[in-house]
Amino acid sequence: MTKIALIQQPASGSRGENINKGVAAIREAAGNSANLLCFSELAFDRFFPAQPAGPDRDTLAETIPGPTTDVFTALARELEVVIVLNFLEMDGGKTFDSSPVIDADGAILGSTRMVHVPDYPCFHEKGYYTPGDRGAAVYDTAIGRIGVAICYDRHYPEYMRALAVAGAELVLTPQAGAADEWPDGLFEAEMRVAAFQNGFFTALCNRVGKEPRMEFAGESFVCNPAGVVIARAGRGSDEILYSDLDFSEVALSHARKLFLADRRPALYRDWIES
């Protein structure tokens, strides 16, 4: 059994303050026997894509490894936990919406970059993010095989299926979901279906709190491979959501016993490219 913790915390205007709060949350969660800890999208900053990118955009970004990963790799090593972050990455003059995955020995196993980049009111992301160029990576961690679907990528069944085909047992979604952004129930329904169709656990960690241009709902949650919500955080609450996962459920799921085995990928190219 693996215990995960989704850190649903509000962000102030101080990155240092937010990182310190995150460190305290990880220590608390590790003290409560959590083995894997995940933050929301851009957890250590106010949600700057709420307004169009300006000339200061690059000052918001940092490298991987860099100052933020240095803090959390040391913490992962000390506490022997897996940590998934999310922030604006700078690499080769380009910026990405990135989630470094840090193993329990402090090693950075890799960094998932958001592939699909939206742009609509209060989510002016095309001005900040270059579309990810690394595909749907799955990481062998101390607790199991995990993938990351950053925010908007969760809407793409091709992306979620790619994680399943690569053997993901758990898919984490660092999310920035505004209050009342979606019709009631749809927020969870999408991830429940993804879990059921692909035979993995899904865990969505959402931002929370009022910011100058918008309010984030929280309501982080975890689904099992049967598509059932097994843990749910409160609306608007600053909290750590815990959930115990039994990865033996993955192999027993309908998706792993039936759906994936019966795929016919030779037919799909013509369908999706037409």
In which residue ranges do the predicted regions lie?
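Cys-nucleophile CN-hydrolase/nitrilase-fold catalytic domain and related Cys-dependent amidase chemistry
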Residues: 15, 23-105, 111, 177-193, ...
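CN hydrolase (nitrilase-like) catalytic-core segments centered on the catalytic cysteine
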Residues: 61-84, 145, 154-240
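Short polar catalytic/cofactor-binding loops
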Residues: 8-14
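Short beta-strand scaffold segments in enzyme catalytic cores
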Residues: 85-87, 98-101, 137, 220-222, ...
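A short C-terminal boundary segment appended to hydrolase-like catalytic domains
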Residues: 251-274
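Residue-level detector of high-confidence beta-strand sites
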Residues: 98, 111-113, 173, 232, ...
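Extreme N-terminal starter segment of soluble prokaryotic enzymes
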Residues: 1-5
